[in-house]
Amino acid sequence: MLSLTVYTEINTLLFPQVVTTNADSDTLFYRPKRSGTGATIPGIRSKLFGLLDLSLEYRSVKGSYVPQFFDQSYDLNRVISASQGNETSIKTKDMAIFEGYDNDWTSSGVYGSASMNLFDLVKFNASYASMTADTIEYNSFNAVINVNTDNIPKLSVANAFYRRNNDKDPFDFDNPSENTIMGYRVGYEMSKGVSLIWEYSEFYRDNGSGELEPVKQTKVET
């Protein structure tokens, strides 16, 4: 069986101006005021045989806006440091993405996603977006696999993910960027309603010499 849904969405991002000075009124940090809007006109979503979900969108952006700005890796790349010679600069995520652009900047492109539920055992989801502004192209790729743990004793959650958003080539796996993050989460059920979660993630940051190196992070939480 096939179901079809047509929809539209409009979203905005607002970034207030931030200025930090020292006692001599020298500017230490400056972030300009920015804003932007993104619209999906139209979007089409379909479901095939109750197993495969597909969606396709045409996206239009004006100003300082990118889809999935607040993704699940936001806490890791909300502030980015970059080194050049003996100087290190600190930028927020919006400063790094929108540097060199103003609120009259426009872009457009397509977004597609597919997810499949395999007999309620494993669910896989992947999405890809390609946006173009003048001659500049930035793309995003996300993939997540979730295991249904309902029938696995003591296992409360099990998933793995790969994300690379707003990048020139998100499939260049040999050359990751600061927008790349991958990892997994595994949960052990200690008692009903209480789980011990082990989360591993790997992302990339400037090592102080202008080169990227992997940062491996492990968290344990309940």
Predicted regions and their residues:
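Outer-membrane beta-barrel "beta-signal"
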Residues: 89, 116, 215-222
